[in-house]
Amino acid sequence: MLEDEFGREVSGVRVSLTDRCNFDCVYCHNEGLGDTRGPMDPQDDEMSTDDVVRFLEVVSQFDIGKVKFTGGEPMLRDDLTEIIRRTPSSMEVSMTTNGTFLPGRAGALREAGLERVNVSQDALDPDEFAEITKSGAYDRVLEGVEAAVDAGLAPVKLNMVVFEHTAEYVEDMVNHVSENAGLQLQLIEYMPELTGHPEWNIDIQRVHDWLADIADRVETREMHDRNRYFVGDGMVEIVDPVENPTFCANCHRVRVTHEGYLKGCLNRNDDLRSMGEMTREEIRETFRETVANRVPYYGEYLIKENDEWVLNDKYLDAPTTHS
């Protein structure tokens, strides 16, 4: 298994299959690339089926044991089932989706090798859900969650971004998963540095404190040193990467954009490495370089000076590698 100079082993990859999406969520940062949502028709710049599989076969040789397929909306890829079926058997396969295409397809994806899904569900109120996602697909998402559970993809993890628009629904969502053994809840801190609108931000520590008070028990997950709050039949965890050196120090993933760029850090786009028409050996070496050049964003790339996060001087002249 490869590790960077900070001792962080890379055990998983997060692969964006498309930047297309049938939602237009107000908080979306498109896997750290910003608001670059593409048109709905298939695009020539998306990695092909063979591109994705070749990359996964190469990195599996480094004991990469997990792959999460993301988007955009990955279920807009007509070849998604084939990609999952051809993923190396040594890898645990999961996917993040808005859930609208799961009805009628969840079973086939499970048979192809998909093991888990995260479904975006930011509110249990249809009107607020429509306002956040710019879609009227609330009922379809609920059907998708049910289809995933029925297909054996449980526990289904519901993703909820916590910000001004959704904060009042956190308690409802926690109660919802506490009453449904097939569901878990992942509360995701809003990232204004990637999406703008800092006025939408809330203090995520208040949510931690509230959950600690109501939880039946609290456990700490090794990855990201993250707390898990068990409430009734459900489990809730918080993803809070903003200004969080602990989160960065425990990051074990490399990302791949839909165009085939290796991306060592969610927050950075100055370290992209294109796989383009590379051979397998070239992909191996480029992946090695990407891992070797990873640095914790908070605590290394950015450092605290006078209570402000500033760019570490040693990275001021860092080369930009987009090709």
UniProtKB/Swiss-Prot annotation:
Keyword set, alphabetical order: 4Fe-4S, GTP-binding, Iron, Iron-sulfur, Lyase, Metal-binding, Molybdenum cofactor biosynthesis, Nucleotide-binding, S-adenosyl-L-methionine
Cofactor note: Binds 2 [4Fe-4S] clusters. Binds 1 [4Fe-4S] cluster coordinated with 3 cysteines and an exchangeable S-adenosyl-L-methionine and 1 [4Fe-4S] cluster coordinated with 3 cysteines and the GTP-derived substrate.
Binding site for [4Fe-4S] cluster 2: 248, 251, 265
Domain Radical SAM core: 5-233
Top-level enzyme category: lyase
Enzymatic reactions: GTP + AH2 + S-adenosyl-L-methionine = (8S)-3',8-cyclo-7,8-dihydroguanosine 5'-triphosphate + 5'-deoxyadenosine + L-methionine + A + H(+)
Record EC number: 4.1.99.22
Pathway annotation: Cofactor biosynthesis; molybdopterin biosynthesis
Residue positions binding GTP: 14, 68, 96, 157, 253-255
Binding site for [4Fe-4S] cluster 1: 21, 25, 28
Protein name: Probable GTP 3',8-cyclase
Organism: Haloquadratum walsbyi (strain DSM 16790 / HBSQ001)
Lineage: Archaea, Methanobacteriati, Methanobacteriota, Stenosarchaea group, Halobacteria
Gene responsible for this protein: moaA
